[in-house]
Every structure is written in structure tokens, then in C-alpha cells.
Amino acid sequence: MIPSDLRTDWTVEEARAIHALPFPDLMHRAQTLHRAHFDPTAIETASLLSIKTGGCPEDCGYCAQSAHHDTGVKATKLMATEEVLAAARRAKAAGAQRFCMGAAWRSPKDRDMDRLCDMVQGVAELGLETCMTLGMLSPGQVARLRAAGLDFYNHNIDTSPAYYARIASTRTMEDRLETVEQVRRGGIKVCCGGILGMGEAEEDRIALLVTLATLPAHPDSVPVNLWTEIEGVPVQGRARAVDPFALVRIVALARILMPASVLRLSAGRTEMSDELQALCFLAGANSIFVGDQLLTTGNPAAWKDRDLLTRLGLHVAPARARPLVAAN
């Protein structure tokens, strides 16, 4: 049975009205829904590894890994499976429950699929949830990754449909949404969110969330990224810092529109004060990345995260049960 508060027919007008509520009312509504679906004191933890860095043919205007931009990021080849598994072991020892593997591609080559599937199987055998972000996938690639045991696939839509053309030209919003739907239909849980602070308007942030909340099914995980300064990318010239309360309002709106989705504070936490992160947790954020590095940006030190959670009386959530998937 689908809970009555899970809707996929939200309108921008409804979302705009909720977003404009007085701050105490907005926070109360978000926290009430959060408590209905989650332990409000539990925070999920994930670790992220770039398994193939740089040289991406896409021209995403925010990305340091695009071959179109002079950012100083050196292109690397796909990592060896054992290197990835060694990193996964370190992540588990550091407290991560989920291990995310990202490759800077438009889409993976079929010749790489055996190694990618080996990585998924190896990470799963360590007892970690598995996640990958590899760009666009064919139906056959989705099926292979699912058979290997992939739990989650990340494919962000980045921004609103109206603002998307300002961000990238080598792939469309429709391309991204098609990939997300293909992953969902293939039986892999969807991780899909966006980036705030790339020069977009408040209306774009609201429309981004409405786009996610009106998918056939809400994403299992919704990463909320804050733009982090990167020299050499087009977005740098028009990026604008996000007001702290504006960020909290967006997190609260995401919780209200998608009450059962995990909301992950992702890139940009190094720019957030402890107080701002606490407000985001109160608004419904319930996941973070652990480890001092994301794909190409920094992340708070492990001791800082442990200290913050302790001071707030929060704890790391137990890993969710992973369904068994037969391998080929």
C-alpha cells in the first residue's frame, strides 16, 4: 500500500505556496512528515570514490571533469577492481554504509561492464550497499548491473527544466529523465537530485524538486548539492552563494514533496556551518557523505562529522536490508 502522503501529482503552484510558508510552519510540516517515515535521530552514511576521473566528453558547465573545460583535472583510466575494493574496505572501516562509485563518462563502454560488475559484486560481498554513477545506460547495461547486485544508481537532473540549457548542451534534460526511468524500470533504486547555487532563480529550485516529485516514483535518494567553487568552468562566472535559510527551505520542501525519500547533504558541506547542517537535519535531511573527498571536491573530516552528530544527539542509521539478486 502506498502511504497517502506520497504524491506524484504536485504542481509548481502548490510547491511555491508551501515554500513560502512562515519558517516555523514550514519546518513543523517537514519534521512531522520526516518523523512519519524515518527515525529523526538517524543519519545514513555513504562514501564516494571516483573510479575513472576526468576526460568526460559532456560539457556540463559546473563539472571539473569535463574535457571541454581547462580545470587542471587529469584524466585517468578505469581503476582496477582490487583498488576499488581496497577503498571500499577503508570506507566501511570509517563508518560508511553505502559505497558509491563514479566514472566520468557519457556512458560506459560494453568492454568495461565485466570490470564494473566485478566491482559491484565485490563491494556487496563486503556488506556495503552499492551505488554507481556512470552516465547514461542502455537497457542491457542496466540489466547487467542489477544482476551483479547494484542497489542504487545515481543520475542527477542538476537543475530545473527551464534552466538546464544554461548548464549543458551535449545532453538534454529529457536524456537524463530517460536514463532515470530506465534505471527504475530495470529494478535498481534511483538516486537523483540537483545542484543549488549555479545562478538559478528560486523558481528553478522549486521546479527542480517538482520535477523529481512528479516522476512515476519518487527517487529513493535525493542528493542536495551546493555549488562549490571550481576555476575554469562556465558556471563559475554566474554562480551565486545560496542563502542559508534558502537552503533549509529547499530541504524542507523536498521532505514535504517526497516524504519517504532519503535526502542527502552532498557537495558543499565544507561551506556549511554546524548550525546550518543542524537546521537541514531538522528540515528532513538524513544522509551525508563521509570521507574527506568526494569526486573532485572536499568533504568535512570524519572527526568533524562524528563530533557534530554527537553534539546533536544523532546516530548513524543501520544499513537497510539489501534484497538478494541472482548474478549471471
From Swiss-Prot:
GO terms for biological process: biotin biosynthetic process. Pfam families: BATS, Radical_SAM. Its EC number is 2.8.1.6. CDD domains: Radical_SAM (cd01335). [2Fe-2S] cluster binds at C100, C131, C191, R264. [4Fe-4S] cluster binds at C56, C60, C63. It catalyses: (4R,5S)-dethiobiotin + (sulfur carrier)-SH + 2 reduced [2Fe-2S]-[ferredoxin] + 2 S-adenosyl-L-methionine = (sulfur carrier)-H + biotin + 2 5'-deoxyadenosine + 2 L-methionine + 2 oxidized [2Fe-2S]-[ferredoxin]. Its cofactor is [4Fe-4S] cluster; [2Fe-2S] cluster. It is an enzyme of class 2 (transferase). Binds 1 [4Fe-4S] cluster. The cluster is coordinated with 3 cysteines and an exchangeable S-adenosyl-L-methionine. Keywords: 2Fe-2S, 4Fe-4S, Biotin biosynthesis, Iron, Iron-sulfur, Metal-binding, S-adenosyl-L-methionine, Transferase. Pathway: Cofactor biosynthesis; biotin biosynthesis; biotin from 7,8-diaminononanoate: step 2/2. Homodimer. Belongs to the radical SAM superfamily. Biotin synthase family. This is Biotin synthase. It comes from Cereibacter sphaeroides (strain KD131 / KCTC 12085) (Rhodobacter sphaeroides). The lineage of its organism: Bacteria, Pseudomonadati, Pseudomonadota, Alphaproteobacteria, Rhodobacterales.
